[in-house]
């Protein structure tokens, strides 16, 4: 199982793929957030040698911005977990990560998935 953290904003989606757990390689990508985001993400995962069916996507609830992507990924057969932002921030603090940027948030989301393995 590959854990993929996604930080979503109005215009872009920051993605972090953990290939070998939190200590292993991490790959990142910024994709446009729009109608083709699901397809673009699936294609990028495939190029990283991660079949979408082997991925577990972790994202935080961000008002309306996460909904289209979460539903689209779920309909494509990809496992998706939507996490409460407050819970994620406390998790990051517990890891000693106090910086708050989109790329760091994507990494923290991937770590959360890897360590907590949400349903």
Located regions from the model:
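Phosphate- and other anionic-substrate recognition elements at nucleic-acid/protein interfaces
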Residues: 1-119
